[in-house]
Amino acid sequence: VLNLWSKLYAYIAQANQILENLEAHQDAIDSSISNSSLEKAAIQGSATEMLIGEVRFLRAYAYFTLYRYYGGVPLITKPTGPKPAYVPRATRQEIFKFLYDEMEYALSKCADNNSGIAYGRVTRGAVAGMLAKTKIFHASYIRRAEMYGDKIAENTTGELSTVSLYADAVKLCDDIISGVYGSYELEDYYPAVFTKRNKEIMFSVLAEEGIGTGNKIPMGFAGEAKYGATNGVHLTSW
C-alpha cells in the first residue's frame, strides 16, 4: 500500500514539474516541434498544448488510481519543495471535478490514434475511454452512499446524479465505437488482442523486450523472463 502511494505521488510530482516547464517554454517548444516533427499534421492546436494534454491525462490517471485505493487524497498540482506544506485530503467532489477538468482538456488537445501520431502516445480514444470509466466509478460511489449511508463514500450533496453520469458514460462509449475519437474495433482473432499495434487496444504501456521498460512485472517483458523466469530462476519442462 505504501509503495503504491509513494510511486504514484512521485509520478504526480514529475507531472507537475513537466507541466510547469512546458508552460514556461511554450513558444520555444512549439517552434522546434513544428519545424522538425513528422507528427505536425496530427497535432490539435499547438504542440505544447498536446503535450500538456497528455501529461494532464496521465496525472489524472494517477489520481484516479489513488482515489480507488484510498478515497479522498491530497490534491497537489504544482511543484513542491523538499518539505512541502501540509495539504488536507480532498473530498470526493473535489477529486472528481479535478479528474473531469483534466480529461476534458486532454480530450480537446490530444490526437486521434489514426491521425499519424506516434504509436504509444495518449490519444483521444484513450482519454474518452478513461473519462467514461471515471464517470461510472463516480456514479457507483454515489450509489453506495445512497444505499448504505456509507461515511467513507461521503454524502451526495451538490454532486451530479447517477443518471447523468451513466448517460455521459454511455454517450462516450457510443462515440468511441462510432469513430468520433479515432478508429477502434474488436479483433476477430482473440490472441491478437495481446500483440502490439492491434486495432482493439485503446491505451497501453509500451515495453521493450529485454529491459522491462514501462512495466515492473517481468512476465512477458523482461527478456528471458518472458517464459516465467524471475531473478535468474527458470521454469523447466515436466
Where are these regions (language model features)?
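An aromatic- and glycine-enriched ligand-binding surface/loop that stacks and positions planar moieties
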Residues: 1, 73, 96, 104, ...
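Alpha-solenoid helical repeat scaffolds
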Residues: 25, 65, 69-72, 78, ...
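Conserved, well-structured interaction surfaces
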Residues: 1-70, 83-97, 101-119
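Short coil/linker segments at helix-helix boundaries
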Residues: 29-44, 72-92, 141-167
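Active-site-proximal beta-strand/loop segments in catalytic clefts of secreted hydrolases
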Residues: 22, 78-79, 205-207
